[in-house]
Design a protein with these regions (language model features):
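Conserved active-site "lid/cap" helical segment
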Residues: 1-77
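Conserved catalytic cysteine-centered active-site region
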Residues: 58-104
Length: 104
C-alpha cells in the first residue's frame, strides 16, 4: 500500500435506471459501474493490481445498489481481487464525499 493517496481521474455513470421504458432500465447498476471502471482504466492506462482501494459514491444504497456496489462492480469489471472497495452514501453529496474520503 502506498503512503500517499493519488486521485488520478474521476468519472461518473449515467443517472441510473430511470424510467421503466428507459434505455438503461434493464441494465443492473453494478454492470453500469463496471463499465465506468473499465472506461477509467482504459482512459488512464493503469494496472488494476496497483489499485489500493475503489471508492465510490452512491446516493441510493438499497435494493440492487446495495452490497457495497464499489467492490462488486470492481469484481464484475475483472479488476484485481486484492483491491477492496467502499461505497459512501451522502445522498446528493455522495460523489463529493467519495473524493474527500479517497484523498485522506
Amino acid at each position: 500500500m502506498t503512503r500517499e493517496a493519488w486521485i488520478i481521474d474521476a468519472v461518473r455513470s449515467p443517472r441510473g435506471k430511470g424510467k421503466e421504458n428507459g434505455a438503461l432500465h434493464n441494465v443492473h447498476p453494478q454492470r453500469i459501474l463496471a463499465q465506468v471502471l473499465n472506461a477509467l482504466r482504459d482512459r488512464v492506462g493503469f494496472d488494476t493490481a496497483e489499485v489500493d482501494d475503489v471508492v465510490m459514491g452512491c446516493g441510493a444504497g438499497s435494493g440492487d445498489h446495495s452490497m457495497d456496489i464499489a467492490r462488486m462492480a470492481a469484481l464484475d469489471a475483472g479488476w484485481s481481487l486484492d483491491a477492496p472497495g467502499v461505497t459512501l452514501n451522502r445522498f446528493c453529496g455522495s460523489g463529493q464525499q467519495a473524493v474527500m474520503f479517497a484523498a485522506q
